[in-house]
Amino acid sequence: MRDRESALSRVDVGGGVYVETMTRDRARLIADIEAFEPFNEQESVDKQVILRALKSDSNCFERSAQAHMATSIWTVDASFERTLLEWHNIYQSWSWIGGHADGVADLRAVALRELEEETGVHGRILPYGCGIPVEGELVRGDGVLEGSNLPLEQDSSCEDSFARGFESFPRVDFRSNGGDVFSLEVLTVNGHEKRGAYVGSHLHLNVTYLAQANPDVPLKVKPDENSALKWVPLDDAVRLSSEPWIRDRIYRKLIAKTRAYCR
């Protein structure tokens, strides 16, 4: 059972009068999405849809909302050449990893938890923004700039033993934008059965994060969500998907953005 939080909090302003205020996590998410620079027209359009929901629907982090927040985690290895996929039981297709917000506005934490719960892998979310890799500079997995003893800012979710397992990867300068949001998409979900109950058609207001993980860590399926897991070359995410819209609109985009990230 996940810890739950209200996306809006009631604050006593005196005289028995209460007003609803945005939680810090919801406000941060809105700020990150507002700062996000769309990669294409799909992201530009969907960014506005997601922001409208975040600013107007206090229930958008709950599954009861017709359009509700969800998150995905596009997970790559240290070379940025392989990604981790699951065989999704409902979609009957090889798929990225993700899940519902379920009342939690910190979607970064939700994404990392979904990755661990559904695959057994600990991930490290990489900053995105509009950053450009700094030519010739590499960062070790423990967050130390090669040739220096000065640590870079470290993701608090990254365990020491996990971080030490990474090879070096390009240092990236994200001062032009900042934030961790890698991709945005509004996803349609057709009605389906889950755990013996019918779930009506709805929309996922999806925020995707880019993460790095160690492919040598043993994979563990989550039988109520998936039935197989594997690391594959980036382009195989397109080849293996049986969902045309996801394949052509999302996976091709994610692959292009991944390759642009580490140029």
Regions found by a protein language model. Name each.
Residues 246-263:
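Charged phosphate-binding loop/patch that engages nucleotide di/tri-phosphates or the phosphate backbone
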Residues 79-117, 121-124, 130-132, 158, ...:
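Conserved Nudix-box catalytic region and its N-terminal flanking loop in Nudix hydrolases
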Residues 2-4, 10, 140, 150, ...:
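Basic polycationic patches enriched in arginine
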Residues 32-72:
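Acidic, metal-coordinating catalytic segment for phosphate/diphosphate chemistry
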Residues 99, 105, 110, 134-137, ...:
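Polybasic/polar functional segments that serve as interface/processing modules
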Residues 136-155, 160, 169-217:
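Active-site-adjacent beta-strand/loop module that shapes the phosphate/pyrophosphate-binding cleft
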Residues 208, 212-213, 220-251:
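NUDIX/MutT-family hydrolases
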